[in-house]
């Protein structure tokens, strides 16, 4: 009964938000930030670890970059070594040029592949097909596409239970090769992703065998066509 009540409340909230979004209602107004701690100093990769051939700091931002002649064998990550947060809010600004990237959270590091991760990801790509969705790297794949509020039951596949907005309308909020504000909220079995002040995807994950309720944070360099991911103003609030 508690689960049904919780799910019903979130579905109702998502439906109301989708209606406001469809009518071009106001974005969620910014509020004063309290309780956030920076996890990137803007000057160095102190506290982070990854393959140095792909990662550097430039103009106050973490930069991960590949080229046609400089490719990882598999997707590789810059991993924050400051802990494995459970319930938290994560805020940062990102800029993506080229192929594909993502922000990992509640993830694990694979023991047999250096700097490889498995877990939840705030996905992003240069063509904006996937930006704003919740994905699981090396796991269950697409969990909540942009515009979706999805639910995963025990041993089940993701099911769309409501909408948080039209995917194409939300796509218009993405700034392409410019700075975007990402806000992730992870609390218990619930994950909310926001881009530039709008909710873009929501997930309730009750698949106890597949989900993780705590884990590492990381930034992805994706194998394949050349890409460049930049991230700055990275801050974390534990809930």
Enumerate the predicted regions with their spans.
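Low-complexity, intrinsically disordered short peptide segments enriched in small/polar/basic residues
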Residues: 6, 13, 157-158
């Amino acid at each position: 009964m508690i689960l049904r009540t919780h799910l019903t409340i979130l579905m109702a909230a998502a439906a109301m938000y989708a209606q406001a979004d469809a009518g071009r209602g106001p974005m969620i107004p910014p509020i004063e930030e309290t309780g956030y701690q920076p996890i990137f100093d803007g000057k160095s990769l102190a506290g982070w670890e990854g393959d140095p051939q792909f990662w550097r700091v430039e103009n106050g931002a973490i930069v991960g970059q590949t080229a046609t002649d400089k490719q990882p064998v598999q997707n590789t990550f810059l991993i924050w070594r400051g802990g494995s947060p459970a319930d938290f809010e994560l805020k940062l600004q990102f800029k993506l040029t080229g192929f594909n990237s993502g922000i990992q959270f509640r993830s694990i590091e694979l023991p047999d592949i250096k700097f490889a991760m498995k877990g939840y990801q705030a996905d992003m790509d240069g063509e904006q097909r996937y930006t704003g969705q919740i994905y699981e790297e090396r796991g269950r794949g697409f969990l909540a596409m942009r515009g979706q509020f999805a639910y995963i039951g025990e041993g089940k596949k993701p099911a769309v239970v409501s909408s948080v907005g039209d995917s194409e309308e939300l796509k218009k909020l993405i700034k392409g090769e410019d700075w975007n504000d990402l806000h992730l909220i992870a609390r218990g079995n619930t994950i909310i992703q926001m881009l530039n002040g709008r909710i873009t995807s929501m997930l309730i994950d009750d698949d106890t065998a597949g989900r993780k309720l705590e884990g590492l944070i990381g930034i992805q360099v994706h194998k394949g066509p050349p890409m460049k991911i930049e991230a700055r103003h990275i801050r974390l609030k534990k809930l």
